[in-house]
Amino acid sequence: MAKATTIKIKLLSTADTGYFYVTTKNSRTMTEKMTKTKYDPVVKKHVEFKETKIK
């Protein structure tokens, strides 16, 4: 059986609210850490979310 190319990652808010999104990414094509601008409902603003590992 082949190794899966998609992995689950956690996108953690840089506003230090503890809010996060869980998404998937292709580990072969996106080798660097993912950053996205998404909505954080705790601070009610769009902030940058950075990739962390799911424990």
From Swiss-Prot:
CC per GO annotation: cytosolic large ribosomal subunit
SUPFAM superfamilies cross-referenced by the UniProt entry: Zn-binding ribosomal proteins
Domain of life (superkingdom): Bacteria
Biological process per Gene Ontology, one example term: translation
Alphabetical keyword list: Ribonucleoprotein, Ribosomal protein
GO MF terms held by the record: structural constituent of ribosome
Record-linked InterPro entries: Ribosomal_bL33 (IPR001705), Ribosomal_bL33_CS (IPR018264), Ribosomal_bL33_sf (IPR038584), Ribosomal_zn-bd (IPR011332)
Keyword Ribonucleoprotein among UniProt keywords: yes
Alphabetized Pfam families for the sequence: Ribosomal_L33
Keyword Ribosomal protein: yes
Sequence similarity: Belongs to the bacterial ribosomal protein bL33 family.
The protein's name: Large ribosomal subunit protein bL33
Organism for this UniProt entry: Sinorhizobium fredii (strain NBRC 101917 / NGR234)
Lineage: Bacteria, Pseudomonadati, Pseudomonadota, Alphaproteobacteria, Hyphomicrobiales
